[in-house]
Amino acid sequence: MERLIFYITLITFIFLLFLYPIFIKWLKKRQFGQYIRKEGPDLHNYKQGTPTMGGILFILAIFFLSLLTYFIQKEDLFLIIGVASLLFGFIGFLDDYLSIKKKDSTGLTAIQKLLLQFLFSIVIVYLISIFNNHSTLKIPFTTKSLDLKFFYPLWGIIYLTGMSNATNLTDGIDGLSGGIYVISALFTALIAGINFNHIPLLILPVIAYLFYNIKPAKIFMGDTGSLALGGILGSLALYYSVELFTILTCFIFISEMFSVIIQVGSFKVRKKRVFLMAPIHHHFELKKWSEERIVLIFWTINILTGIVALGGVL
């Protein structure tokens, strides 16, 4: 039955490769295009109108495959991943839809988005407590664990919210966020010890999307996809207590998020910016790095930190 899941995932991947061009045409016909942030780099202005919400297809694929795995194999993790992909994808969908409707890059307000993330994080943390109740964090490069006791639910909510924001912030260059997700999910799943036949369902749908998102991108995942990817990664890490490992397996996502925190904090306290622009990939764009160079270097860095993380499993 494990091989069955693998073969169905493979068929789904091939199906998505053929479905994405049709979906792109459908989005163009309905003028569901991306609105570029005014405060973003001028280099991105030519991307205005590129079809967005491409995350819908890979989210539905991951949701379907996750539920199938849950019902066939009784793997509780995949019920949680399926629910997380749908809930966080819904937040992103609302944001994208409102942005398109208002013909502006702003959809949900920051507070609205954060409240929904907190609410859905509570749901996921509650589900994890039902199926795999624990309060510990595995510490890399040791055999020890850190017990957070009654603080663990709060930690889980903050962690999951942070991870969904991290993946969202990284989605700013063609091929960047999707590629980093594939690398991060692969290494996190290997560290968690997931069955090899089940790992492809986490990454192949996103690889199908990447075929059409590598520069020049024919479609963007939108917040629909980027928020969902963070929900999936965060749920996986929380379920197996490997959150500390994701500092390495999700190194670029974490770095992008902290570059924004550092930038905002520095400007509020010192009235000075640390980076030319945050998230940090925009800093390198303004340094005249090409998108291809940034993506290649960021992918490579995340692969290397992922390998280091594997060495931390004792």
Swiss-Prot record:
Signal peptide: none
InterPro entries reported for this sequence: Glycosyl_transferase_4, PNAcMuramoyl-5peptid_Trfase, PNAcMuramoyl-5peptid_Trfase_CS
GO biological process: cell division; cell wall organization; peptidoglycan biosynthetic process; regulation of cell shape
Gene Ontology cellular component terms for the protein in this record: plasma membrane
Catalytic activity: UDP-N-acetyl-alpha-D-muramoyl-L-alanyl-gamma-D-glutamyl-meso-2,6-diaminopimeloyl-D-alanyl-D-alanine + di-trans,octa-cis-undecaprenyl phosphate = di-trans,octa-cis-undecaprenyl diphospho-N-acetyl-alpha-D-muramoyl-L-alanyl-D-glutamyl-meso-2,6-diaminopimeloyl-D-alanyl-D-alanine + UMP
Pathway: Cell wall biogenesis; peptidoglycan biosynthesis
Cofactor: Mg(2+)
Keywords of the record: Cell cycle, Cell division, Cell inner membrane, Cell membrane, Cell shape, Cell wall biogenesis/degradation, Magnesium, Membrane, Metal-binding, Peptidoglycan synthesis, Transferase, Transmembrane, Transmembrane helix
Pfam families: Glycos_transf_4 (PF00953), MraY_sig1 (PF10555)
Keyword tRNA-binding annotated: no
Chief place where the protein resides: membrane
Entry keyword annotation includes Transmembrane helix: yes
Entry's localization field: Cell inner membrane
Membrane topology: Multi-pass membrane protein
Gene Ontology MF term list: metal ion binding; phospho-N-acetylmuramoyl-pentapeptide-transferase activity; UDP-N-acetylmuramoyl-L-alanyl-D-glutamyl-meso-2,6-diaminopimelyl-D-alanyl-D-alanine:undecaprenyl-phosphate transferase activity
EC number: 2.7.8.13
Source species, domain of life: Bacteria
Transmembrane portions of the chain: 4-24, 52-72, 77-97, 111-131, 146-166, 169-189, 191-211, 219-239, 242-262, 294-314
Function: Catalyzes the initial step of the lipid cycle reactions in the biosynthesis of the cell wall peptidoglycan: transfers peptidoglycan precursor phospho-MurNAc-pentapeptide from UDP-MurNAc-pentapeptide onto the lipid carrier undecaprenyl phosphate, yielding undecaprenyl-pyrophosphoryl-MurNAc-pentapeptide, known as lipid I.
UniProt similarity note: Belongs to the glycosyltransferase 4 family. MraY subfamily.
NCBIfam families cross-referenced by the UniProt entry: mraY
Protein name: Phospho-N-acetylmuramoyl-pentapeptide-transferase
